[in-house]
Amino acid sequence: MGKLGRETLFLDICNKNDIEPTPALVKDIVGYNMSSITASNMKQQTKEELHKDTLVTSVEKETNDNTLKGFTEQTVYMSELLMTKYPDACNRLIGILEKHSVKYAFLKGTKDIWCRDYMPVQTESGKFIQFKYNPSYLKGNKDWEESRSDVEEVCRVNNIHAQSSDINLDGGNVLICEGRAILSDRIFSENPDKTRNELIDELGKLLECEIIIIKALYSACEDFTGHADGMVRFVNKSTILGNRLSDDYKYIQDDRRKIIKKYNLKYIDVPFFSTKDSKHRDSAIGIYVNYLKVNNLIVVPVFGREEDKEAVDIIQKAFPDKVIETINYNEVAIEGGLLNCTTWVVR
C-alpha cells in the first residue's frame, strides 16, 4: 500500500468506483467497525483532504458527553502540520506505528505541531479535561503568539467533547499513572490568580489524582516550557524514569530526593545532555524521556550519541513487557520538542 493506510486506500477505491462503504464492507476490508455515517462522510472528501500520501484514520469514538466509553486500545493523534512541515520525521514515525498496528490520525485546525500541549488531558476514567492554553512562553513573540492553537476550535472541528477548566496548563506538563499525576511547579507561575493550595485541590479533583509537584529549571533559557515530560516519566505509580540526577543542578537533585522520599518513589536515572546553540536555543535533542508510549509500544528518540544505547537499555529494562523502537526525530527536536510533545494519545 506504500504510504497509504488501509482506510485511505479503501475510501479512495470507493470514491473512484462509486461504491458505498457500508459498515459490513468496512469491517471486511479495513478490519474494524466504522459507522456508515463516518464512512459516507469520508467518501465525499476529496483526495487532497485525505492527504494523498498520508493515512488519515477515521475511527470515531462515540462521545455522548466528555467521556470515552468502552475503548481500551489507544490511538495516536498528530497535528496535520507535522506531516506538512516535517514529512520525513512524520513518515518515520508512521512507519513504526504501522509496523505495530497502532491506529493513528491527524488533527485538523491546529496552528502548530505540539498537540500534546493544547489538546485535552484524558483522565484514567476516560474524561477529557480541556485546560486553558495560554502559556507565558508564547507571549512577547509575534510569530509564537500567532501559532497558538484555538483549543475550542480544534476540538470542534475534530468532534472532541471536553470539560472546560480555567486553569492555564499545557498537556505536556501533566503525567498521569494509577491515581497519581506529576506536574512541574511552572503551574503556579502560569496561574498567579490562584493559590498553590487552590490549584492543587482543583487539579486533584479534575484529574482524579493525587498531585505531585516537581521543580522545573529556574532558567527559561534552559527550559522554556518547564514541562514535566521533559524531566520524568512514570513506569508505574511507585517508579519513575528521570533525567540523571548526578548530571543535574543541585536544587533539582534536592527536590527530586525530597519527592522520592515523600511519595515513596523509586527513581531510575536516564542519561541526558544538551546541545543548545545560538541557532537552536530551544533544542530538545538529548532528552530521552520524551518518548512516545502507546499500547504495548514505546518509541524512544535517539541522537547518534554514545548515550543512545544506555538510554534505550534502561528504558527497556524498566518496561520489560513493552516493545521498544528507536527513531531519529532530530529535525523536530531542534525546534524544542520530541515524541510526547508531538503526539496526543487517547483511548
Task: Describe the function of each predicted region.
Residues G2-C14, P21-I37, K43-T46:
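Amphipathic alpha-helical segments in structured regions that serve as interaction surfaces
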Residues E20-P21, K194:
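Short coil/turn linker and secondary-structure boundary residues
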Residues N17-I19, Q316:
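Generic N-terminal simple sequence motifs
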